[in-house]
Swiss-Prot record:
This is Cysteine--tRNA ligase 2. InterPro entries: Cys-tRNA-ligase (IPR015803), Cys-tRNA-synt_Ia_DALR (IPR015273), Cys-tRNA/MSH_ligase (IPR024909), Rossmann-like_a/b/a_fold (IPR014729), tRNA-synt_1_cat_dom (IPR032678), tRNAsynth_Ia_anticodon-bd (IPR009080). Keywords: Aminoacyl-tRNA synthetase, ATP-binding, Cytoplasm, Ligase, Metal-binding, Nucleotide-binding, Protein biosynthesis, Zinc. A motif ('HIGH' region) lies at residues 32-42. SUPFAM superfamilies: Anticodon-binding domain of a subclass of class I aminoacyl-tRNA synthetases, Nucleotidylyl transferase. Monomer. It is an enzyme of class 6 (ligase). The keyword Cytoplasm applies. Its EC number is 6.1.1.16. ATP binds at residue 274.
Length: 465
């Protein structure tokens, strides 16, 4: 079997993967900030790094996979205040929803799933070390900031120089910072901050900045120098750049050897995002499509390429997955172990070892399906199931998949005034802090093809999906 090669964002090239310790891989992936339901962009990240850890294990590595949860953040605080609920109530609810979405998509849970609030002492320890090493300072407003000009290699991941950033980036002015590009490590608490959002420190009551959370959790759980760090392309700068500056400023050694970034999800050639109003939650998609169809839709595109979201592409994914299941119908696969010397297995492995080239791996599945259709051979059927299983696919009985209800959920014919009445009932439920009833109304509307979007200030918009 060929050696695994990974596209390393830091090197801007594919490199042969060599773990720091033979036979072991330590991998950290930036997880989700839990203040709302996961959207399709989150789904892509979750599926991509699920594939990565599955393949690493399949080729014999012992993997420690850490994916964090950000459970303290300005967005979380704002949402909790809007809802009139505690931070813990909000984050627990959306962590549960995230786990439900993951289970539906066949995503294996990471080995360790730390919450940021569980590692406050480690974050403060790293901040104090950065201060001792000359990289951090407490500003006049009480915040503790990182001095980017003190870190000689700032910009090595993103390729952005400090001069370019100062000339071209829009940076919010802050008179308390020594440089507008400096970023916060510790935010001084404000009088209006709700309970449960501040911790005691030598710098005063406050909470961690977003970037220090991942540095501290990664170094604590995987060591100060580990193999792979992953996340969405949008995290490359500034989040991952700042992680490098923090971690290497604190430890004096290389933080991570291989940086992996998955591409954006696009709608009509624009990035899917809440600010553009063109995003869909996983739950909205699963109201209309089987979860394995959604997973297949993500898997068949290379992880670094843009993923174009549309009903047409999801319908095509459903038809393609149906072809694979149809090939297995009425063929009893044998139960032998997977033989990597088999030609299809070799082609599949070569694709996956070439920077997780899932389009070529999926093409190999269709080659196998064609041969199964032609020969009805039990050995080929077994290979098809085994190789697809490494991608988290074809795990059900073919008839169970093929007999399921297909097609999009039909709109229930609700008139606009009926929809508005249900929204009003949901608002009343939220005001009464009956969040279960509010969630039930949202789900009921989704079943009829109506998606809700809560806006800042308490208003709610709806659209047909």
């Amino acid at each position: 079997m060929e050696s695994l090669r990974i596209y390393n964002t830091l090197a801007r090239d594919k490199q042969v993967f060599v773990p720091r310790q033979s036979g072991e891989v330590r991998m950290y992936v930036c997880g989700i900030t839990v203040y709302d339901y996961c959207h399709v962009g989150h789904a892509r990240m979750l599926v991509v790094f699920d594939l990565v850890q599955r393949w690493l294990r399949a080729i014999g590595y012992r993997v420690t996979y850490v994916r964090n949860i950000t459970d303290i953040d300005d967005k979380i605080i704002r949402r909790a205040v809007e809802n009139g609920e505690t931070i813990k109530s909000l984050t627990d609810r959306f962590i549960g929803a995230m786990h439900d979405d993951e289970s539906a998509l066949g995503i294996q849970r990471p080995d360790i799933e730390p919450r940021a609030t569980e590692f406050i002492p480690q974050m403060l320890g790293m901040i104090e070390t950065l201060e001792t090493n000359g990289y951090a300072y407490q500003a006049t407003d009480g915040d503790v900031n990182y001095s980017v000009r003190k870190f000689a290699n700032y910009g090595k991941l993103s390729g952005k120089s400090l001069d370019d950033l100062r000339a071209g980036e829009r940076v919010a002015a802050n008179d308390a910072k020594e440089d507008p590009l400096d970023f916060v490590l510790w935010k001084r608490a404000k009088p209006e901050d709700p309970e449960g959002t501040s911790w005691a420190s030598k710098y005063g009551m406050g909470r961690p900045g977003w970037h220090i959370e991942c540095s501290a959790m990664g170094c604590t759980l995987l060591g100060e120098h580990f193999d792979i760090h992953g996340g969405g392309q949008d995290l490359q700068f500034p989040h991952h750049e700042n992680e490098i500056a923090q971690s290497e400023g604190a430890t004096g050694q290389t933080f991570v050897n291989y940086w992996m970034h998955n591409g954006f999800v696009q709608v009509d050639n624009e990035k899917m995002s809440k600010s553009l109003g063109n995003f869909f939650t996983i739950r909205e998609v699963l109201e209309r499509y089987d979860a394995e169809v959604m997973r297949f839709f993500i898997v068949r595109t290379h992880y670094r390429s843009p993923l174009n979201y549309s009903d047409v592409h999801l319908d095509d994914a459903r038809a393609s997955l149906t072809r694979l299941y149809t090939a297995l119908k009425d063929v009893e696969a044998d139960t032998l172990a997977l033989d990597w010397n088999e030609p299809h297995a070799q082609r599949f492995a070569a694709a996956m070892n070439d920077d997780f080239n899932t389009p070529v791996a999926v093409a190999t599945l269709f080659e196998l399906a064609g041969e199964v259709n032609r020969t009805r051979d039990a050995s080929l059927a077994r290979q098809l199931k085994q190789l697809a299983g490494l991608l988290g696919l074809l795990g059900r009985e073919p008839r169970a998949f093929l007999q399921q209800a297909s097609g999009a959920a039909q709109a229930g014919g609700l008139a606009a005034d009926e929809i508005e009445a249900k929204i009003a009932a949901r608002v009343a439920a939220k005001q009464a802090k009956d969040y279960a009833e509010a969630d039930r109304i949202r789900a009921e509307l989704l079943e009829t093809g109506i998606a809700l979007e809560d806006k800042p200030g308490g208003s709610t918009e709806w659209r047909r999906v």
